[in-house]
Regions:
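Sec-dependent bacterial lipoprotein signal peptides
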Residues: 1-20
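N-terminal helix-cap/turn-to-beta initiation motif at the start of protein domains
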Residues: 17-32, 123-124
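Short, low-complexity intrinsically disordered segments
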Residues: 1-2, 29, 131
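Short, flexible N-terminal segments of the mature chain
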Residues: 45-54
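Edge beta-strand at a domain terminus
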Residues: 57-63, 103-135
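Contiguous, well-ordered beta-strand patches that form the walls/edges
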Residues: 35-42, 55-108
């Protein structure tokens, strides 16, 4: 009986620990996006392809990673034989808001030119994201 209770207690502890672990935001799925020209897009991340508007690209992802308590993913997008590095950066604890960046330096992946404001639920405003999240 004691062994059974001890096993049950251990199981409950493991379940509560797993439930308490902070899950990383997911890239996969459809994102509402806006660029600097205020043009709206749908960006859809799948396992190894990303669709930006009507254009499909192959990509590889490294992450999630964290820096300065922020979560980000490093992407390598392949287009016409050329590979370009990008970062999808989550500037808050929210899993619905992200910035699509082209880093100036691969050693500083969360610093660079913002290409798109991303939001899972609603249409983002590029310039309000710049003002709010890029300091």
């Amino acid at each position: 009986m004691k062994r059974w209770l001890l096993g049950l207690l251990a199981l409950l502890c493991m379940v509560s620990m797993v439930a308490c672990i902070k899950s990383a935001p997911s890239l996969e799925g459809e994102w509402h996006a806006q660029d600097a020209l205020k043009k709206d897009y749908a960006i859809v991340f799948k396992k190894d392809k990303v669709k930006i508007g009507e254009q499909d690209y192959n990509y590889t992802v490294d992450g999630p990673k964290s820096k300065d308590d922020f979560t980000y993913y490093s992407l390598k997008v392949k287009d016409q034989g050329k590979e370009t590095s990008y970062t999808v950066f989550f500037p808050t604890k929210s899993k619905e808001v992200a910035l699509f960046l082209e880093p100036n330096d691969e050693k500083e992946p969360i610093k660079g030119q913002m290409l798109f404001a991303l939001n899972k639920k609603e249409k983002p405003d590029y310039y309000s994201y710049v003002k709010k999240y890029l300091k």
